[in-house]
């Protein structure tokens, strides 16, 4: 300060501590999926885990983003507002097709649950972020899973 030397001010900055998030194992994810009673949440959790998506990425998915021929999904406005292509596992495609037969929304892959799955056909908004987070917290508490789930919760 004031262009004057500071005697004894040879300070070293403390290193940043970065903690890695807990990783959910396949067995733990299977317990989460099995314990989730609401079909749309069950399919959503399975989809996020199997494709490595973030919560917002999964909510924004549209029917047209699924490329079944090339077995990939177009994720729009991912982290950093970039698009990316994600591999689509065959089992996930099967689950998504079965789920779509239930709601039949022509645009949204995970339509709002506000009017139930019967009203999902005409839904113009995706599932509620807070509802998904609350459902996951309830399921993980129910099965006794103590891990922090960074991509979902």
Feature-to-residue mapping (PLM):
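Conserved catalytic core of the tyrosine transesterase superfamily
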Residues: 1-153
């Amino acid at each position: 300060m004031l262009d004057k030397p500071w005697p004894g001010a040879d300070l070293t900055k403390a290193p940043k501590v970065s903690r890695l998030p807990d990783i959910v194992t396949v067995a733990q994810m299977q317990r989460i999926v099995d314990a989730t009673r609401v079909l749309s949440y069950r399919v959503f959790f399975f989809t996020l885990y199997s494709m490595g998506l973030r919560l917002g990425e999964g909510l924004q998915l549209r029917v047209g983003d699924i490329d079944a021929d090339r077995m990939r999904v177009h994720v729009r406005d991912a982290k950093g507002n970039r698009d990316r292509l994600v591999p689509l596992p065959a089992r996930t495609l099967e689950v998504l097709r079965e789920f779509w037969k239930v709601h039949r929304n022509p645009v949204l892959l995970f339509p709002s649950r506000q009017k139930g799955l019967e009203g999902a056909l005409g839904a113009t908004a995706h599932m509620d972020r807070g509802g998904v987070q609350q459902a996951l917290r309830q399921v993980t508490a129910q099965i006794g899973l103590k891990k922090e789930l960074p991509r979902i919760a």
